[in-house]
Every structure is written in C-alpha cells, then in structure tokens.
C-alpha cells in the first residue's frame, strides 16, 4: 500500500521473525521511513540497513543522520515530462514512441 505506518508494522514483524536480518529494501521512501522507525524501535539501528526509492527530503534527513543507508532518485520530474511528451506524440501521430532511458542515481551520505 506504499504507506509508512503499514511498512513499520511489516518491518517490525520481519525483524521479529528474522533476528539475523541485515537489510530492508523498501519500494519507496515513505515505506523506508516506516522501516527505519521499526528498526529504531527494535534497537537495531546500525545493525539493519534500510534503503528506499524516490529521494524525498525526509529520506535525506535520515541518510544524513545515518539511519537510512540510501535512496534511489528516479527523477520523477523527468518521468512526468516524458509521459506528457509521449501522450502528445500519440495524439499527434498515433505512433507509440520508443522507450526512453532515464537516469537513476543512488543517493548516500556522500552525495548530501
């Protein structure tokens, strides 16, 4: 569901069920925030690494604080522009545009 609260519940369960767990990779940064909260509550900050996607400002703060290992910046702003351009091309020509590659950047404490 991409929600911070639900991610915290799921991460807490995973941490309980798998005491040797070393990392959690979350599908977005909101879920990563929930996972970080669960790791913190379990007293396992530093022992369990957490990563996310989207590069939101709240994730950046946790990276700077050492609670979140990294986030992936998928450049959503570019994806939105490409989506609009694709739609306009389809409307104008009826042709389906070729795939476009967009960069994905790993954001760690070294980039902040």
Protein language model features and the residues they cover:
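Conserved hydrophobic residues forming the short capping helix/wall of the S-adenosyl-L-methionine
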Residues: 15, 39-40, 91
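Short beta-strand elements at the ligand-binding edges of bilobed clamshell
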Residues: 65-77
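Glycine-rich phosphate-binding loop signature in dinucleotide/nucleotide-binding domains
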Residues: 14-20
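Second-shell loop/turn segments in exported
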Residues: 20-23, 70
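Hinge/cleft segment of the Venus flytrap/periplasmic-binding protein
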Residues: 75-112
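Hinge/beta->alpha junction and helix N-cap segments in small-molecule ligand-binding domains
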Residues: 1-10, 26-31, 54-58, 74-79
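Alpha-helical elements of Rossmann-like donor-binding domains used by nucleotide-donor carbohydrate transfer enzymes
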Residues: 9-13, 34, 82, 86
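Venus flytrap/periplasmic-binding-protein-like
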Residues: 25-68, 107
């Amino acid at each position: 569901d991409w929600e911070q609260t639900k991610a915290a519940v799921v991460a807490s369960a995973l941490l309980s069920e798998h005491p040797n767990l070393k990392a959690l990779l979350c599908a977005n940064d909101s879920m990563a925030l929930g996972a970080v909260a669960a790791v913190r509550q379990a007293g396992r900050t530093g022992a369990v690494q957490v990563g996310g996607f989207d590069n939101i400002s709240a994730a950046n703060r946790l990276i700077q604080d050492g609670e979140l290992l990294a986030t992936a910046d998928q450049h959503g702003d570019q994806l939105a522009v490409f989506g609009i351009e694709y739609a306009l091309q389809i409307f104008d020509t009826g042709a389906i545009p070729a795939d476009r590659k967009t960069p994905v950047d790993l954001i760690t404490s070294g980039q902040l």
